[in-house]
């Protein structure tokens, strides 16, 4: 594998928007019993449903441990799904995997961020995370993609969204958290994002969704739907702890121009619930020192914004909630040329994330 000493921007590469043409989507099989209940079996069933939904639109590669390889291969029984053996600590490939970048000559490379399990030993979600730290490089090696390495700079893919035209959205709650890059200022972080993703403007939302254990990842709160337009998780209930977070984000978006000088059009997506785990669901998770505790009294950070755009499709979570159909209608209206597929999201939410968190798109080569 070729490791490059330059930066994507210096080499003419940039991170494309999620709606750009894709070669495939990467996923990692969920199995750790101290995060996924009942040995991961319910989450694996949801994983299969999501992988098969994506595979209707484009190829999927699922990385799985040697112990679970036969099981995963048997259940992911579609020609468009490739299963490869790869060790990992958990399934969150959006965060542990690489970010792909492209240029105008038909080349694809990858950025291999440093990963510390959402905070390391200062509020991180599990230890060790050494296998997840290797995952980005392994994916790039399988794909024969040259890589850029950001030693000393921690970033998860779920903490950023880009429009492919120079603007990035993130949250202060995550990227300025002391457990990520305490040695860097906001300005230094913006410079690194510019160098490695070729963005010209970073828009900082104060916080993400309430109780998001990733420290407020933007992909669970606000996402691009096209240049100049975003979809923001929303509640009109002043008693909801998300109320102030949503309004603070809206204020920033309504009073900020993007890198192209455009004012934002902000669409609102209702937040489901409030949603909570049951005592039975929490009891099904192994209790291991150092892992995230599951508590039925703690509100879950459910969000319909945590969807994935694929070639011709939108794969969005459903929660067996009355708001599910409204969410589907909103997404279909916003993406009239895509087919909206609602996939089971509750088991993923119980594990701490959702569809966007558990997937990583690989862009197709592009030539001008």
Curated annotation (Swiss-Prot):
EC number: 3.5.3.12
InterPro entries in the record: Agmatine_deiminase, Peptidyl-Arg-deiminase_porph
Source organism, top-level taxon: Bacteria
GO molecular function, one term: agmatine deiminase activity
Pathway membership: Amine and polyamine biosynthesis; putrescine biosynthesis via agmatine pathway; N-carbamoylputrescine from agmatine: step 1/1
Gene3D superfamilies per record: L-arginine/glycine Amidinotransferase, Chain A
Family matches, as Pfam families: PAD_porph
Stated role: Mediates the hydrolysis of agmatine into N-carbamoylputrescine in the arginine decarboxylase (ADC) pathway of putrescine biosynthesis, a basic polyamine.
NCBIfam families linked: agmatine_aguA, PRK13551.1
Similarity-based family: Belongs to the agmatine deiminase family.
Oligomeric and partner information: Homodimer.
Protein name: Agmatine deiminase
Record lineage: Bacteria, Pseudomonadati, Pseudomonadota, Gammaproteobacteria, Pseudomonadales
